[in-house]
Amino acid sequence: MYIRGSKWNMQKKRRRVNPFGVIVVVLLIGVLIYFDRTVASTIPALFVSTPTPTRAPESFITEAQKLEADGKYAQAIQTYNQAVLADPRNPASYMALARLNIYTNNYAEAIKNAENALMLNNNNDTALALLGWAYGLSGDYIQAESKINQALAINKDNAAAYAYLTEVYVYEMQAGQGVLEILDLAREASRTAVALAPNTLETHRSRGLLLNWTANYEEAVVEFEAAVKINPNIADLHMELGKNYVATLEYDKAIDEYGKAVSLNPNDPTPSTLISRVYFTNGDYAKAIQYAESALALEPSDPVLHGNLGLIFWRNKQYLDAVDQLRLAVRGGTTPEGVAVTGLELDYNRIGEFYQVYGLALAKTNQCGEALQIAQAVATGLRNDDNAQFNAQEVIIMCEALAKAGIADLPTATPFDNQELTQTATVSPTP
C-alpha cells in the first residue's frame, strides 16, 4: 500500500551525486598516498633511537694492529676484545690477544684466549704453541710441554713452538725440575728454532734465556739486543737484557734497560727492584733505597720486597730500619699503613740471606733474645751453606760480647755454646 502525501512514505528520494566532490576526494587520496610514500618515510619515528652503522670487525683488527705496533698494548688488547665481540668466530683475534697477554704478564688471560682459539679449531698449531708457552710462564711445565708437543705433531716446522719449548725447559731448570737430560733437550730445541727461523723475536728471546742459564752472558746479550731491536715494547725483554748487562758488569747499561722496563710497565715492582740491586752493588745506597721503596709502594704486601729494602738498610748501617723490614720478610706482620704481610719460609739463596741479616741486625741492636732464635734457625735449616753457618756463629759471638758486657737483653746473660744452639727447635716464620 502506498499512501500518497503521507510522512510515512518508505521510499526516500535519491540524491544526485556531485561530480566535483568526487574529483576532490580522489585528489585528496592521491595526495595522501604521495605523502606516505615520499615524505613520511623520511621522518624518524618518535622515541626511537637513530640507528648507527655497524662497524666491520676488520676495522677493529686493523686499529688493534696499529696500536700494537706503537707499543700501546693495553689499548690494543681493548680493541682486539672489541673485534672478538664483533666477530667471535675469528681465531686470529684470540691468538693476538693471547700473545699480548703474555707480553703484559697476564698469563691466565693468555691461556683463556688461546683456548678460545682452539675451540674454533683444535688443530691450530699456533694456538697450541701459544697455550703451551702461557702454561710454561705460569709454572705448569707438564701442560706446557704437552701443548707445545701437540703443536709440533701438527706442524713440525713451527719454529716458534721450538722456541717456546726451549723457554719451558729453561724455566724447569731454574725451578730445579725436569728430566736429567733436560739441558740437552733445551739445546736441541733451540738449535731447531735457529735452523727454521734464525731472525725471529721468539728465537732470539729463547736462545738468550738458554745462554744466560749456561752462563754465556756475552752471547746472551747479543741475542737479547737483537730481540729488543725487533720489538722494543716488551718490558720483560729489557729486564732480561739488563740482567745480562749486570752479569757482564755493564751496570749503566743495565740501569738503562731496567728504566725502559719501568716506563713500559710502571705497575710492576720488578724493574725498580732490579735497579735498586744494581745501585746496592755499586755502593750507592741512597739511590738503592729510593728504588726499593718505589717497588715496595707498588706491592706493600710482598715480603721479598721488604727483605730487599731491609738488606739495603743493613748495608747503609740503618740497623733499626733493617730490623723493621726484615722482620716483616721473615716473620710477617702488618705494615704501619695496615697492610698484612706473610712471612717467608726459611730457604736457601735470597730468603736465607734475609734470615741471616735479620739475625745480625737483631744482635747489632741488642735484641739477642730473638737474634739467637734466628741464628738457631739458620744453623739448622741452612747447614749446607758455609756463609750461613758463619753468620749464625757471628750472631752468637756478638751476643756473647753483649752478655759479657752486661748489656744483653737476655734474662740470664751467659755464654752460648754452639752445641746448645743446634738442639733448639727451629723457628718458623709466623704469618
Residue ranges: model-predicted function:
Residues 1-55, 141, 146-170, 175, ...:
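Long, contiguous interaction/recruitment modules in multidomain scaffold/adaptor proteins
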Residues 19, 45-48, 335-431:
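Terminal, low-structured helical/coil segments at or just beyond the last alpha-helical repeat
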Residues 53-106, 137, 171-179, 202, ...:
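Alpha-helical segment of the N-proximal tetratricopeptide repeat
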Residues 55, 89, 123, 157, ...:
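Structural signature of alpha-solenoid helical repeat junctions
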Residues 57, 91-92, 125-129, 159-160, ...:
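Helix-start (N-cap) detector for alpha-helical repeat units in TPR-like alpha-solenoids
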Residues 71-78, 104-116, 138-150, 173-192, ...:
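Structural signature of tandem alpha-helical TPR/SEL1-like repeats
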Residues 86, 120, 154, 196, ...:
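Structural marker of alpha-solenoid helical repeat scaffolds
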